[in-house]
């Protein structure tokens, strides 16, 4: 570098130092001028359009928001719309619990994340987004899976909790811990084109999740968005409504006198609708919030409340090892020129899954249709005219779960003997064998 360029660079650095000093001085003056106000001057500008809405309570309401701590469990389809609106509104501290990482398949609905953050922890991605949106708030992340051992430590100190999870097990856990800590919960769920929302344990007088659902749904009735799909704007609206309900709680819109338990149901298709149903209140016999409750902090932390056992789990491991083949073994027989002459290739995914991406040689009979045949071979032969009791049948599904159930069904109900499923399913084949196939 010659002397001219060195001198020029030195001058630029000096100018930057001077500008930095001036900015610091201006900031100090602004902070000094706002000492007599509950908010900084920048915060008055930031929240002004919100404070002039009469229902928010003006400056006093904004101070309530600033002094409130809200914990959001899940930074997915529900948490993504709720988080930025809570941050934008000025909630003073926001906690985010999520140990998942951002995946490409999330981005159509979890719009707080973006393509550059694939592989990043969702809680960290969310933290980066909302702190850029509002630098006046404090954000705490918990990159862990919520369980009986850590829930009390995480929840402690928060005023409100948003349950943005997608499993009954976690909903029971969140509700139980919140009741024991005296925290109000905004709880929601969504799937496909629909969603629902409610408020649990309002001010320790409202019903908890167990008051509504004393027993969990059977495992085979529970569908995740990974299995059933979800429309982004539909789940987004429900998440946004969660933020609205949280603001109403913080601002005191709901009181012990006017609060009535409710369940809001949103449907996006074919025409959008929003219905609100009155729900029953706190139940005296409830095991968690009733008079003789047994679900206590001690019982939960000691593991006496077995949530996995209580909620159950669908058992997919129903096949013997010799009834399953690896994707490598499947690849070898699939590439055989006489594959179709020797085998019947059955894809048991739902038809709309099959239409997205499939092997051209596979015949699609959804597992639901197989069940409806109730072991009637003639009904199966209407779909597969060439199938016989001694046919070699290879079954494929999305992940290798339904294919096991279908294998068991064909053997036990229909009487077939030569049936095998592909371990790991269609997606395992794509990951390990052929990445050129569309993966949805």
UniProtKB/Swiss-Prot annotation:
Has UniProt tagged this entry with the keyword Nucleus?
no
Report the protein's function. Answer: Plays a central role in 2-thiolation of mcm(5)S(2)U at tRNA wobble positions of cytosolic tRNA(Lys), tRNA(Glu) and tRNA(Gln). Acts by mediating the C-terminal thiocarboxylation of sulfur carrier URM1. Its N-terminus first activates URM1 as acyl-adenylates (-COAMP), then the persulfide sulfur on the catalytic cysteine is transferred to URM1 to form thiocarboxylation (-COSH) of its C-terminus. The reaction probably involves hydrogen sulfide that is generated from the persulfide intermediate and that acts as a nucleophile towards URM1. Subsequently, a transient disulfide bond is formed.
EC number in record: 2.7.7.-, 2.8.1.-
Kindly list the positions at which N-acetylmethionine occurs in this protein.
Answer: 1
**What name appears for this protein in its UniProt entry?**
Adenylyltransferase and sulfurtransferase UBA4
Q: Which residues cross the membrane?
A: none
| Cofactor note text | Binds 1 zinc ion per subunit.
Q: Which UniProt keyword terms apply here? A: Acetylation, ATP-binding, Cytoplasm, Metal-binding, Multifunctional enzyme, Nucleotide-binding, Nucleotidyltransferase, Phosphoprotein, Transferase, tRNA processing, Ubl conjugation pathway, Zinc
Natural source organism: Saccharomyces cerevisiae (strain ATCC 204508 / S288c) (Baker's yeast)
User: What gene name is given for the protein in this entry?
Assistant: UBA4
Question: Cellular component GO terms, alphabetically?
Answer: cytoplasm; cytosol
**Binding of Zn(2+): at which residues?**
208, 211, 286, 289
Q: Which GO terms describe its biological process?
A: cell budding; cellular response to oxidative stress; invasive growth in response to glucose limitation; protein urmylation; regulation of pseudohyphal growth; tRNA thio-modification; tRNA wobble position uridine thiolation; tRNA wobble uridine modification
- GO MF term set: AMPylase activity; ATP binding; identical protein binding; metal ion binding; nucleotidyltransferase activity; sulfurtransferase activity; thiosulfate-cyanide sulfurtransferase activity; URM1 activating enzyme activity
The record's subcellular locations are: Cytoplasm, Cytosol
Q: Which InterPro entries match?
A: MOCS3/Uba4 (IPR028885), Rhodanese-like_dom (IPR001763), Rhodanese-like_dom_sf (IPR036873), ThiF/MoeB/HesA (IPR045886), ThiF_NAD_FAD-bd (IPR000594), Ubiquitin-activating_enz (IPR035985)
As stated in the Swiss-Prot or TrEMBL entry, residues carrying the post-translational modification Phosphoserine are 326
Please list the residue ranges annotated as the Rhodanese domain: 339-438
